[in-house]
Amino acid sequence: MAAVEALNRLRGLDLENATLSVWAFKKSTSRNAKFRTSSVVATPELATELKRIARQWIDRCTEVDDYSLIATINESSCLYLESDETIFPQLQDLVSSPPEEHLIEAISDLEGSLGYLIRLTIGADTLHCVCRLGSDWKVKKRAHVLNLVLNRNQLDLAGDEAFIIPKRFDFFVLNTDILVTNKGNFESILEYKKTYAISF
């Protein structure tokens, strides 16, 4: 029942009027912390687009099952578990800090990021939308191609410091509830693999 309630609450959120911050995160080499984070300032246009993508991925979820080792996800389903079963609270603590105190200082702060998340505050609720990035998320990898942008009917250079992000989110964390839309990426980001002891 908790899974269905969590999905219904997620689907009912007013994302359009939410306060948004954007964070990139990397794995930490420290023994005490699993992640390092940097915040980035999103233009109003980017904020609107990120909310639109989040809404699109939330709306496609019409079914939910409890997370398990053998559970699968189809194009209209997601899996449910509680965040305290994972290391997500460590990432959550970092992105709960004021974004302006953790702004990126150089492009290298973004290069090699494991993922990015948007943090949306809607009244008393906080929603984290998390996406794993590819291993090639580096500006220097695109030294032999041109980044172009289409503006009206004109093609122009987008500049050398362009990044590409997927139009998806791999999991959503609403307060303490996690709803997973990509099991592999979720497990990779949070180093999560639920195991079972089988008694004979």
Task: Please annotate each region the language model reported.
Residues 2-50:
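Charged, amphipathic alpha-helical stretches
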Residues 29-199:
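Acidic, low-complexity, intrinsically disordered interaction modules
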